[in-house]
Amino acid sequence: QEQIARSLGEGHRVIRGVAGSGKTLILAFRAEYLARAATRPVLILCYANGIAGRLEDAMQNRGVEDRVQVLTFHSWCYRMLRTYGIPAPSPREYPDYAERLAASVSEVVKAVDQGHIPMAQYDAALIDEAHDFEPQWLALAARMVNPRTKALMVVYDDIQAIYKGRERPVWSQ
């Protein structure tokens, strides 16, 4: 997996594999490889807290935790809002948790569109569990990648998708 991660070349990459095929391990090795050469942070986004925690541990074990940010997508959205002084949707406004999460994503997209949150903050963005991401989330993550590096990596397995009813991304976009 480490050799594959180093030999992926430049630009955007989409990796599809079945459960247990080593997708997350390849992603971790790739993040380390990119982080060692990066001038800006590397971002890893996941859907679930458990995988985010394991990837965060992996980055610490590899000594690149100061160059790699590992977050769930929604935690990253809240961090962006907090970092740039934009009020996050509150439980009072959105008592339903899922609606509050969706509103946080909308606020980040709006803030990026309006220039309140800068694009291209990361030399690379790597997305694990992309089968559980909505197309809008992937598009937002892609906007955060430095256009010079074009280093967006997405790993997925449609069979593992938690939310089967979600709109599926068109990977060529």
Walk through the language-model features, giving the residues of each:
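Conserved helicase motor core of SF1/SF2 NTP-dependent helicases
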Residues: 3-6, 12-84, 124-173
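Conserved RecA-like ASCE ATPase "motif II neighborhood" in helicase/translocase motors
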Residues: 84-121, 129, 133-143
